[in-house]
Amino acid sequence: MQNIELRTGVWYNDRSIQLSFPDAWDVVTYWPDTPLPLTDEQIAERINRPVGQPPLRELAKGKKRPVVVVDDLARPTPVSRIMPFILKEFEAAGLRAEDIRILVATGTHGHQDSTALAGKIGQPAYQRCRVIVHSDLRGTKYVGTTSFGTPVYANAELPKADLIIGIGGVYPQHTTGFGGGGKLMLGVLGRKSIRTLHFRHKGVGGTYNIDNDFRKDVTEIARMVGMNTIYTLHINDRSEVVSLFGGDHYSYYPQAAAFSKQRYTAPLPDDADVVIVNSYPSDVSYTFVRKAMKPIRCASRDAMKIVIGSMHEGLGHHGLFQQGLSDRIREYTELYNRISVMKPRVILQKIIKNLFSRKQPPVKPNTVNAVSPPAHPMWLYRPEGATEPIQELEGVKVVKSWEAVVKGIQERFPAKSSVKIRIYPCGSLQCLDIPAGQDQGSGD
């Protein structure tokens, strides 16, 4: 048998799992080309030598109310790996851990499990600092409007802070090319601001272009609020830190995004019989497992599609892009969100356009090019250990046994002695180049 070791269970029961395949099968795993994990000495050096700014210990001198913005459980950033070094910098500036507020950037993601959050931030910081979990529905303050017309409602802690720094990561995003940088600000905004950003700007689809209006808008918000210092991490398929940028994110962000594109590039699964995507390290819930599904969306219609994810939070939650809804409800919800951010004249133009278009004779559907539903369900392998149940999902077959998956492959390809298997070990980190607009992933 051929054995492949992967990780699963981010934040809750992070562990190794083993996938076994018959020796005759053609199994290829597309591992990312990441460097070795950083040592303590390397992390300390990069924090002490930030890009375009003095060290944090100098920025923090004389400050009384610093805020550290960190991404939430929906992101795999191992904040605990660098938080001890950050606290040392504050201590060198004369600040105690008790003086520091850690603001968790949840966006519209809702509740955060306290035990998992303590593990992400690190127990010492979680116990000593004041940890505040952001709510997009309350506790925000209007701080202005961007040049794009986005009203900015930020967490009320930010206008009161005399120093704001961020800790986040750079992960592929269909909205801004990559996350991280100024996009970390989105997680500490009010619902109106977040809705406007998502539904006023077009995403970049299957490309990784960071030169887009969505990113320009969130970067402008970061400047407006004063989050000018961010520590940006890259991780490998085991959630170990392999790269760290710190300091002026406006300067270094293009380089950080280029690192992601270069190191995590993987080929398309063009000729695969079976495409297997491990959603770790974003397998916290089905909502965010979907961030890993680009190889699934790029696979041929006849390929067997398998996603791996523990999903300890079950279906999960997203205030704008909730999973598990019927197609009609999802369609109406998106329509409401889009209309809610339009200017009155734009709404009027669309109404007039619709009225005129209805007078045209109906166009017969092109049966040749019509998109038909998949012939087979996507398999979702949920390794044992997760306790939160998940509802039945249309077009998805959930299994908890790897043996059942292998049996399913054998039944699907009974005449093939050498089944062509292609594995993406950390799908939410990996980059696949496809034509713009072909891939429309789920929300943040």
Where are these regions (language model features)?
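N-terminal amphipathic/basic leader segments beginning at the initiator methionine
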Residues: 1-47
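Glycine-rich phosphate/diphosphate-binding loops that line cofactor/substrate pockets in enzymes
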Residues: 51-67, 92-98, 266-273, 299-300, ...
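Short glycine-rich or small-residue beta-strand-to-loop segments that form or flank ligand, phosphate
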Residues: 65-76, 101-107, 275-278
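C-terminal non-catalytic interaction/assembly regions of soluble proteins
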Residues: 91, 292-444
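An acidic, phosphate/nucleotide-engaging active-site surface
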Residues: 112-178
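Divalent-metal (Mg2+/Mn2+/Ca2+)-assisted nucleotide/phosphate chemistry catalytic cores
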Residues: 150, 154-213, 218
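Membrane-embedded hairpin module used as a gating/binding unit in multi-pass transport
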Residues: 208-284
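Active-site segments that bind and position negatively charged phosphate/pyrophosphate groups
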Residues: 250-315, 319, 336-339
